[in-house]
Design a protein with these regions (language model features):
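Active-site-proximal binding-pocket segments
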Residues: 182-201
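C-terminal, non-catalytic "cap/extension" segments appended to globular domains
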Residues: 2-5, 14-23, 44, 214-344
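Post-HExxH zinc-binding segment in Zn-dependent metallohydrolases
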Residues: 145-188, 279
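Active-site His/Glu-centered metal-binding helix of metallohydrolases
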Residues: 128, 132-136, 154, 278
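Contiguous, non-catalytic segments that form substrate-binding/exosite surfaces or channel walls
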Residues: 1-113, 315, 333-340
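Active-site-flanking segments in enzyme catalytic domains
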Residues: 125, 135-139, 259-263
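Short pre-active-site segment immediately N-terminal to the catalytic Zn-binding motif
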Residues: 109-128
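Catalytic Zn2+-binding segment of zinc metalloproteases
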Residues: 133-145, 161
Length: 344
């Protein structure tokens, strides 16, 4: 990294920081909390063993809907008409392409489109339950900042209910791959821990240069000049790559280049893992079911539009700075893992 490289890196960081501060204000409010929780979870659970064997069972469309309907009944019967609607009005799509499209929900001209990449096992059930949670929370609504932040909490909650139902009905882990929730959580944490220091250093101390290594060592961990340079170089190359891919997509599709959209794509290396960590942790946490249903119904409505993340955590009776919170997280992850081990 030469002087010009650091100037370029800081320009990227400045754009990302300004974007996040304006559009994702809760990120910085709880950044340190999520980092400390992430460190604790990673140190406590990174050595968990997961069996990678996976089987297919040619689960039919009818089988998938049957199981998802039972899962939704377990959460709240009032959502069954919504489930039937997505089937009858063409909002549910199963992708059979060899090239994966991904599992996702999106609002499209008043419709709430759910796409599921077929795995041909009970992951199809779990994935549909997850995306259906997004559907209920978002269809026909303008997503608020709070709704964006907590969206994965709702999806993960529905996913965990699906896993619990399938395990209780005697299905084995090689059909469920329910361990993916913990594996993805640990992956998100690994990336978050890796990316967190640069944005938090820029947030507190401003421009990054080689001298910033001393502050890095003071607040994070010891690192020599070569490794610090390499860390910064990796981020610079990643931002360059994201920019290059975005410009290529715009060129190939005759899209107008939108600078704010480009910065949003770059910002996701900090915000996406944050959202998935927070969402998974809350979904695993022992919460009052009625409070969760209220969030599903109202997260993106006027009822919650003036609430902050602090208000939501208070409503859920959560103090993320407390030892009780950490203990409950440990217990929740351990209990989830034990339930998986029973069906391996």
């Amino acid at each position: 990294m030469n002087k010009d490289d650091y100037i370029k890196l800081n320009k990227y960081l400045n754009n990302i920081f300004n974007y996040l501060e304006k559009n994702d204000k809760y990120l910085f409010m709880y950044l340190n909390n999520i980092y400390n929780i992430s460190l604790h979870i990673y140190e406590s659970f990174n050595d968990l063993y997961f069996d990678d064997n996976e089987t297919t069972n040619n689960l039919s469309f009818i089988d998938i809907i049957y199981h998802v309907e039972n899962i939704i009944k377990k959460i709240d019967c009032k959502y069954i008409p919504d489930l039937k609607n997505i089937i009858n009005n063409g909002e549910l799509n199963f992708s059979y392409n060899k090239e994966e499209e991904g599992n996702y929900f999106l609002n499209d001209n008043g419709l709430g489109i759910i796409n599921i990449d077929r795995e041909y096992n009970f992951q199809d059930v779990i994935n549909l339950a997850h995306e259906f949670g997004h559907y209920l929370c978002n269809k026909g609504k303008k997503q608020t900042r709070l709704g964006y932040l907590l969206d994965e909490f709702i999806g993960r909650y529905f996913e965990i209910q699906a896993v619990e139902y399938l395990i209780n009905n005697g299905y084995k882990e090689n059909e469920l791959k329910s361990s993916l929730l913990i594996e993805y959580l640990l992956d998100n944490i690994y990336e978050f821990i890796k990316n967190y220091p640069l944005i938090i250093m820029y947030y507190h101390f401003g421009a990054i240069d080689l001298e910033s290594r001393k502050l890095f060592c003071k607040y994070f961990y010891s690192i020599d000049e070569d490794d610090f340079n390499e860390l910064c170089q990796e981020k610079l190359e990643l931002f360059d790559y994201i920019k290059s891919e975005y410009l290529k997509e715009c060129s190939n599709n005759s899209f107008v280049v939108d600078e704010s959209e480009l910065i949003y794509e770059m910002s996701k290396i900090f915000s996406e893992d944050y959202r998935y960590i927070l969402g998974t942790v809350l979904a695993l946490y022992p919460l009052n079911k009625n409070d969760i249903i209220d969030l599903v119904d109202n997260l993106n409505t006027k009822k919650y539009e003036n609430l902050t993340l602090s208000d939501i955590l208070k409503k859920l009776d959560i103090d993320i700075n407390s030892d009780v919170f950490i203990k409950n997280i440990d217990d929740s992850i351990n209990n989830y893992y034990k339930s998986i081990k029973k069906v391996m």
